[in-house]
Regions:
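His/Asp/Glu-enriched, well-ordered alpha-helical/loop segment
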Residues: 1-13, 83-84, 89-90, 95-168
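Histidine/acidic residue-rich metal-binding segments in metalloenzymes
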Residues: 1-90
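Residue-level signal for inorganic ion chemistry
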Residues: 16, 43, 93, 123, ...
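Glycine/Thr-rich phosphate-binding loops of Rossmann-like dinucleotide-binding domains
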Residues: 26-27, 50, 98-100, 173-174
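Short glycine/proline- and charge-enriched loop/turn segments
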Residues: 56-64, 101-109, 180-184
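A short acidic, glycine-rich active-site loop
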Residues: 63-74, 110-114, 186-195
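Short, positively charged
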Residues: 68, 132-133, 176-181
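C-terminal cap of metal-dependent C-N hydrolases
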Residues: 108, 160-212
Length: 212
């Protein structure tokens, strides 16, 4: 399907973005196509960079996402794709589900996992050493805005301040008490994470993170 869409896009000379890649083969097709198609971009989720299909051996529906986790070889290819710039975006995959729909057997449970709150800390904890902080910020902030043709904020005198304030080294434990989502479909409660967002400044107005 990826190759089909690439061929159609090449014919129409349009803009095409693949949201969440999960396989090495798809990535290889896109890597080749990017050499001739300028308006082509792609992303993957933070979860596909951290987990492979071994995580669902116990049929834990907290890790049931779509596209599904692939092999370790696929995951390593995605990591390399982020590092070498083939993959432009790292997404949170945030897809909350109601508790009633997840308290069922694996085959009946919906796809999805909450991820917005922990996407950046997960990347700092598990990917920073491999791809670096600058690449994480590029894939989570700058590239998405560029792809959507939105203005990328700059820090310059006379301009409104738009930024996120975070401590990349602060450790904290993600649990049900500090979960900001109304849903709880995640297998990451209890995880110790690096990186804490203190707040944001939007158009020079400060919005503090109420969590401590």
């Amino acid at each position: 399907m990826v190759n089909r869409d690439l061929l159609i896009n090449k014919y129409h000379e349009g803009r095409l973005h693949f949201n969440i890649l999960s396989s090495k083969k798809s990535l290889e097709h896109i890597e080749v196509a990017k050499k001739t198609q300028n308006n082509l971009s792609c992303g993957t989720s933070i979860f596909h960079l951290l987990f492979d299909d071994e995580i669902i051996n116990q049929f834990d529906n907290r890790f049931k996402i779509l596209p599904p986790f692939r092999t370790k070889e696929d995951r390593n290819a995605l990591l390399e794709g982020v590092k070498n710039g083939t993959i432009d975006v790292i997404t949170s995959y945030h897809q909350p589900n109601e508790k009633e729909t997840t308290n069922v057997e694996f085959s009946l449970s919906p796809f999805g996992s909450i991820g917005t709150q922990v996407c950046f800390p997960l990347a700092l904890t598990y990917l920073k050493e491999y791809i670096g902080l600058e690449k994480i910020v590029q894939c989570m902030s700058i590239n998405p805005r560029t792809i959507l043709q939105c203005e990328v904020p700059i820090i310059k005198e006379g301009y409104g301040a738009n930024m996120t304030l975070f401590n990349p080294d602060k450790k904290w434990i993600y649990n049900k008490n500090n979960n900001t989502s109304m849903s709880e479909n995640t297998g990451l409660f209890g995880a110790e994470l690096n990186g804490f967002v203190h707040g944001t400044i939007h158009e020079s107005n400060y919005h503090k993170n109420l969590l401590k």
